[in-house]
Amino acid sequence: MSIDIKFTINDILFNQESLQKKNKYTCPICFEFIYKKQIYQCKSGHHACKECWEKSLETKKECMTCKSVVNSYNDLSRCLMVERAFDKKECCCIYSFTEQIVQGGTNCSPPDGASDQNQRKLIKDEENGCKEKIEVDQIDSHLINCQYKFVTCSFKGCEKILRMNSLESHQNECGFKLVICDFCKRDDIKKKELETHYKTCPMVPIDCSQGCSVKIERKSIIDHIENDCCNTQIPCKYFEQGCKVEMKRSELQNHLERVNHQTYMGILIDKLTNQVGHSKKTHDELLKKIEDLSLLIIKFSDACLKKQVLPKALDICSNGYRNKWIISNYSSLAKSKLNCKSLSSPILLILSHHFQVCVYPKGDENKEYISLYLRVNNIEEPNSLKVEYSFTLVNVLDKSKSITKRVDKIVFISPKEWGWGKFLLSDLINKENGWLSNDDKLTIEIYIKILNEEYEPLES
């Protein structure tokens, strides 16, 4: 972020004393240079800045110098030649200076937040300041792009103030710059804290503390010492069987070859044999428990299934099965020449019997009517099934206009279809009449009840 230095034209203008003496480029009333001021003159050629004219004309309608009558701005003329001439005067860049806060009074206004005792002082920076000479009308554009302006470092925590042209080199070395650890890849480490981070980073390779000349990541050093380091003191592998010798890991093989461990090996074999027998016994016990649990699960599942299915089956036996079949895109299906002659519902599984509802949009015999039939798929002679059923063609605009047709008793002895060939005129089935919904769906309500068997009386 750039830091602006407050300045007046007096701070940067070349030959200002000479220009002030000529009185051509200063207002004769406020005695300020005409930088960024509009200059007006009376008919006699006496000029002053716009601000001074405004204050004067509020009280007196006359020229402040010659006292000639001036009723309003219309009596004045703009001194553009004077303004343009001043715009071409040379000055230095404010960033050719450095700014210091000093004790005691100066002619300069203190910056924001500074007291009268702590005021600013501009000091020419011959070594690092801007060397460019510019014209007055170029000041603003130059200051925007000046590479010598003061800026703050963009890294959080850094309070360094420096010139723009040295910002890049500073930020490359700034201690507050966030860098990535080469080892753990953390990307939130300040550059000045990187060396400290390396001292605790779990991924930094460090020397083994036991002098084995192997470099290991800090996080793995304990595992290395306990399991891999050749200089770690370890007991003989038959320690528990009686060999109490300890040695470096690198000496273990030599120890095993040099010392006869046959007795210890026998003890170990006996121990392992006992462990194998115990493990086999445990394994057999676990298998038996698994088998018992499996039987319990099957028994429990059957009980749950009966608990869920039985009430539903009893309800269907008593009250019958009810559902809806909603046929989407009915108009398209009815008009399509590629589709089959009839439409079949999904299978209805009712007490182990497979039912289907069949719709003939163009009729099975008479094309002027829609036909509706019921079919039982899994029945063959000599078996039979007595059924009571009904179909309701739902009118979505007026439920009272819905059409219901019912069969109180029919005996199925084969997968033959039973129902109505002339249920409703096909031309009536449209959205306007309410038989189709706005999204072209036909709804059929289904009721099916399997009737109880009738038995002949017993005689003896």
UniProtKB/Swiss-Prot annotation:
GO terms for molecular function: zinc ion binding. Pfam families: MATH_2, Sina_RING, zf-TRAF. Keywords: Cytoplasm, Metal-binding, Repeat, Zinc, Zinc-finger. Disulfide bonds: none annotated. Residues 320-448 form the MATH domain. PROSITE patterns: MATH (PS50144), ZF_TRAF (PS50145). It is found in: Cytoplasm. CDD domains: MATH, RING-HC_SIAHs. A zinc finger (TRAF-type) spans 141-194, 196-253. A zinc finger (RING-type) spans 27-67. Gene3D superfamilies: Apoptosis, Tumor Necrosis Factor Receptor Associated Protein 2, Chain A, Zinc/RING finger domain, C3HC4 (zinc finger). Signal peptide: none annotated. One of its GO terms (cellular component) is cytoplasm. Its main location: cytoplasm. PANTHER family: RING FINGER PROTEIN DG17-RELATED, TNF RECEPTOR ASSOCIATED FACTOR. The MATH/TRAF domain binds to receptor cytoplasmic domains. Belongs to the TNF receptor-associated factor family. A subfamily. Probable adapter protein and signal transducer that links members of the tumor necrosis factor receptor family to different signaling pathways by association with the receptor cytoplasmic domain and kinases. This is TNF receptor-associated factor family protein DDB_G0290883. It comes from Dictyostelium discoideum.
